[in-house]
């Protein structure tokens, strides 16, 4: 339509029209050449909005699109989910998303580079009832599931979170508390700032309060895995 309209313009207006078009083209080429990062910045939200409904039972396609629109408009990104509850996207970066799906559950995704040309998606689903426990999965950017063992060789075990007793007095306290820590629970968190995965020991949250207090002096700090050479390593 613009071309048809331009035919009826005088030469002066034609020249101005084409100058404007050239300026826009130059700006576009500059952005395309220098702004590769800004193009890749669209990828996290694009992957999220394109996620199959089968992988997002509580959030509809409209919910997911609304999250993005609200945050980009500097608004609180809260929606009514498929079951009538409230869900909120709390973080959105070029390669990371975090959603408070329900008051007791969260969902995170992170785009990770496998090599110079390939990225994959890592997701962490966490449910707290009341102790938190997480499930980690990996997908292609087209949401085809990948074998987790290829990208996360091993998970921390109970002994990774607990320091052995150092003296005879501690041994009895340690053994008593350790026997009650009979189920490994841990919360995993992806980072929006770097390519790390942090595991926090949550077994004490389900134990009796007295036993949890006895175990507390023997607990190690959260364990951090770093994404390197296409997999998470401790």
Locations of regions flagged by a protein language model:
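Mid-length scaffold segments of soluble, non-membrane domains
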Residues: 120-154
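Acidic/hydrophobic-patterned starts of short beta strands in beta-sheet-rich repeat architectures
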Residues: 116-126, 194-200
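Bacterial Sec-dependent N-terminal signal peptides
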Residues: 14-47
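Short consensus segments that form the blades of beta-propeller domains
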Residues: 99-100, 126-132, 211-216
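Terminal domain-start segments
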Residues: 42-112
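Short aromatic loop motif centered on NTY/YTY
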Residues: 148-227, 233
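Short, small-residue-biased leader/transition segments that mark boundaries at the very start
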Residues: 1-13
């Amino acid at each position: 339509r613009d071309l048809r309209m331009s035919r009826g313009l005088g030469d002066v207006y034609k020249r101005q029209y084409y100058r404007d078009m050239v300026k826009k083209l130059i700006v576009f080429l500059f952005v395309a050449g220098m702004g590769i990062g800004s193009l890749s910045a669209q990828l996290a939200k694009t992957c999220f909005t394109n996620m199959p409904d089968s992988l997002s039972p509580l959030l509809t396609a409209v919910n997911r699109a609304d999250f993005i629109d609200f945050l980009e408009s500097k608004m609180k990104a809260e929606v009514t989910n498929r079951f009538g509850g409230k869900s909120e996207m709390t973080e959105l970066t070029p390669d990371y998303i975090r959603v408070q799906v329900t008051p007791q559950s969260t969902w995170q995704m992170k785009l990770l580079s496998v090599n110079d040309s390939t990225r994959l998606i890592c997701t962490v689903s966490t449910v707290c009832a009341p102790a938190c426990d997480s499930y980690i999965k990996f997908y292609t950017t087209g949401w085809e599931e990948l074998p987790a063992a290829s990208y996360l060789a091993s998970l921390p075990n109970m002994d990774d979170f607990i320091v052995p007793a150092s003296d005879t007095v501690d041994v009895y306290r340690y053994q008593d508390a350790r026997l009650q820590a009979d189920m490994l629970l841990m919360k995993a968190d992806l980072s929006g700032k770097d390519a790390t995965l942090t595991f926090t020991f949550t077994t004490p949250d389900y134990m009796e309060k007295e036993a949890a207090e006895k175990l507390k002096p023997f607990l190690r700090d959260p364990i951090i895995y770093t994404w390197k050479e296409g997999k998470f390593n401790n």
